[in-house]
């Protein structure tokens, strides 16, 4: 479906049309990241378990995305600049350390049959669509177990997905999580994402400029391509229960 949009889409400028047809880039993304961790009994701050788990998950996502694009290439042909690309010569796979048997087979299939799309994965914020699907937004932690959020002029009550007596203790507030762990998790995912991720940084008024700079340096060291918003909040301001009702 995403590939078909390229041919059916309306392009406001000819340059966008030329580029889209040339590389056939799509932006296959994910949502419900924090929800997924909690469903697998992993707390965000449990760094080793967290990073190991998502490294495997996003490797699988990338593998099946490439495989699907390879199958499309057999049917419809490769994107026009495939020949001589990192996909064609195998550098894409070498750069990411994809050396297992299944990856070697896929690398050979891509070389032989091509790839329909030059770019595959990109993680969007999914702030609104996650509400519809009943999960957490994008790859961000939840802001609280229950809170009010403004969406297009309306106040929407939000409750952490799947909240119960067990998951209550697994969910962690975005503003109390060590942001350096979030950046390293972002780096673990980035290895498998050829484009970028919409990742927010959550800070409190107690943060110093040095701490904020260190978060950005951690992101850079982890290989993160880009960050989204820096969201600030004072932890001393408590939500009013009567106002919330």
Each PLM stretch: what is its role?
Residues 19, 50, 82, 86, ...:
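Flexible domain-boundary/linker segments
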Residues 21-31, 52, 56, 60-67, ...:
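Conserved active-site and cofactor/substrate-binding residues in soluble primary-metabolism enzymes
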